[in-house]
């Protein structure tokens, strides 16, 4: 089967994170400081204000279970990584058999690719924009940031509940039907 460049871009649209695989189209991703994911380099180091984000990724695309955001907001790269680790930690700690460990897969469908800038405390106004301090991902209402497959419904619900406490936005559990 011949794949065009556009179809390859669509296939690599979402960030797929498992224990051994990291891929994202258009970015050079680096794992630094405790496996935190953000772009290695960008064309411009400081971001601009956008006009909003379209609700893309509102349906399950890879797994059978997922978490859906109930309101729009921002997710920091630390919150994304903490939620991913909470999900993986629950899955691997509570596993009763090795079959569960081999079959469990987790997809993170958001990437913190927007830089956040800030100025130091007690600095006067003016003199340009501040230095980049962190990375965020914009999440729209109904977007699915995390998906999982290869687990039972009860374990998936429990893992989604643990992961929901990490980001600052409210989420709900969804199931493919």
From Swiss-Prot:
Q: Name one GO cellular component term.
A: ribosome
The question of whether Glycoprotein is a record keyword is answered with: no
Q: Which GO terms describe its biological process?
A: translation
Q: Which UniProt keywords apply?
A: Mitochondrion, Ribonucleoprotein, Ribosomal protein
The terms under GO molecular function for this entry are: rRNA binding; structural constituent of ribosome
Keyword Ribonucleoprotein listed: yes
Q: Which family does it belong to?
A: Belongs to the universal ribosomal protein uL16 family.
What this protein is called in its record is: Large ribosomal subunit protein uL16m
């Amino acid at each position: 089967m011949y794949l065009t460049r556009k179809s390859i871009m669509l296939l690599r649209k979402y960030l797929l994170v498992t224990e051994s695989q990291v891929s994202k189209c258009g970015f050079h991703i680096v794992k630094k400081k405790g496996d935190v994911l953000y772009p290695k380099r960008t064309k411009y180091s400081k971001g601009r204000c956008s006009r909003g984000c379209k609700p893309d990724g509102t349906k399950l695309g890879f797994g059978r279970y997922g978490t859906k955001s109930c309101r729009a907001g921002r997710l920091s790269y630390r919150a994304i990584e903490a939620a991913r680790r909470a999900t993986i930690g629950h899955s691997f700690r509570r596993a009763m058999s090795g079959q569960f460990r081999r079959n469990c897969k987790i997809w993170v469908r958001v990437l913190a690719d927007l830089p956040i800038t800030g100025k130091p405390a007690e600095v006067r106004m003016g003199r340009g924009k501040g230095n980049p301090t962190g990375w965020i991902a914009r999440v729209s209402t109904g977007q699915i940031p995390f998906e999982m497959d290869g687990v039972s419904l009860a374990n998936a619900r429990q893992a989604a509940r643990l992961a929901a406490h990490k980001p600052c936005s409210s989420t709900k559990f969804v199931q493919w039907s």
